[in-house]
Amino acid sequence: MDQYCILGRIGEGAHGIVFKAKHVETGEIVALKKVALRRLEDGFPNQALREIKALQEMGDNQYVVQLKAVFPHGGGFVLAFEFMLSDLAEVVRHAQRPLAQAQVKSYLQMLLKGVAFCHANNIVHRDLKPANLLISASGQLKIADFGLARVFSPDGSRLYTHQVATRSSLSCRTTTRSPLRSRCPCPWRRCCLTSLPRHWICWVNSFSTLLTSASQLPRLSSISTSSQLPCLPIHLSCRFLSV
C-alpha cells in the first residue's frame, strides 16, 4: 500500500471497502478494494477469486473495468481498479431531467458491447444492475463487479447455481426452477436495466425478443403474491409483503 496515497472513501460492499487513491510515482488515480480475510484458514473469498479470474481471462476491453493489480495487505489483500467517477444508478438518481435519447442509446450500446465481449470470452456476469455499470468522467460505461461471474460451458454441459444475485432483476426462468445451462440471465437483465428509469421504458419493447416470450412484458410492472407463486423455489423463499 506504500505506493498509493488514499484520497477518500468511495463506498463499502459485501466483501470490502473501496477507496479512491493516487499512485505515488505515476500520479494515476485508482479505486482500491480492500478485502479482509475473516479467518486465515479460509483463504481468499470465492467472490474475489471469481472476479480476479474473470477479469484476467478476458483481458482489457473498453467496456469492462480494468483490474490493474492485486497485492496482499495486512490481514487481507487489495484489488486496484481503474477509477470511474460514478455508476449508472447514481447518474439516473441525480438526473435533473430525463436522460436524452442519444445518451440512453449510447449507454445501452456500450452495455450490449460489454456483455457481448464477456460472452465471447465465455464469461457470464450474472449480476448486471445499474450499480455495477460504472461511468467515467467522459461518459464511458464499463461493466464491473464480476464476483458472481462464471466461466460458461459452450456445450451447455455445466449446471449453474440459482444464486445469481439481486432478486428484483431475476429472470422468470430462474424463479421457476429451470436449470441454468445458458447465458439466459444476462439478456433478461439487460431488459430490466433499460426499464428501471421511467423514461427508459420505451426501450424495453425494442429488446422484447431477449425475453423468453413477449407476453411476459406486462408482468414486469405487476406485483406477485404468495398465492400467485405457491411453489417458489426454496433458494428464493422470503416473506411476501402486504400491499
Curated annotation (Swiss-Prot):
Broad enzyme group: transferase
Any one GO cellular component localisation term in the record: cilium
SUPFAM superfamilies: Protein kinase-like (PK-like) (SSF56112)
Gene3D superfamilies listed in its UniProt record: Phosphorylase Kinase, domain 1, Transferase(Phosphotransferase) domain 1
Enzyme Commission number, as recorded: 2.7.11.22
A matching Pfam family: Pkinase
UniProt entry tagged with the keyword Phosphoprotein: no
Positions of the catalytic residues: 127 (proton acceptor)
Domain of life: Eukaryota
Record: residues binding ATP: 10-18, 33
GO process terms (BP): cell division
SMART domains hit by this protein: S_TKc
Subcellular location: Nucleus; Cytoplasm; Cell projection, Cilium
GO molecular function terms listed in the Swiss-Prot or TrEMBL record: ATP binding; cyclin-dependent protein serine/threonine kinase activity; protein serine kinase activity; protein serine/threonine kinase activity
Domain Protein kinase: 4-243
Transmembrane segments: none
Catalysed reaction equations from the record: L-seryl-[protein] + ATP = O-phospho-L-seryl-[protein] + ADP + H(+); L-threonyl-[protein] + ATP = O-phospho-L-threonyl-[protein] + ADP + H(+)
Assigned keywords, A-Z: ATP-binding, Cell cycle, Cell division, Cell projection, Cilium, Cytoplasm, Developmental protein, Kinase, Nucleotide-binding, Nucleus, Serine/threonine-protein kinase, Transferase
Principal location class: nucleus
Known partners and oligomeric status: Monomer. Interacts with TBC1D32 and MAK.
Task of the protein: Required for high-level Shh responses in the developing neural tube. Together with TBC1D32, controls the structure of the primary cilium by coordinating assembly of the ciliary membrane and axoneme, allowing GLI2 to be properly activated in response to SHH signaling. Involved in cell growth. Activates CDK2, a kinase involved in the control of the cell cycle, by phosphorylating residue 'Thr-160'.
Family statement drawn from the similarity comment of this UniProt entry: Belongs to the protein kinase superfamily. CMGC Ser/Thr protein kinase family. CDC2/CDKX subfamily.
UniProt name for this protein: Cyclin-dependent kinase 20
Species of origin: Macaca mulatta (Rhesus macaque)
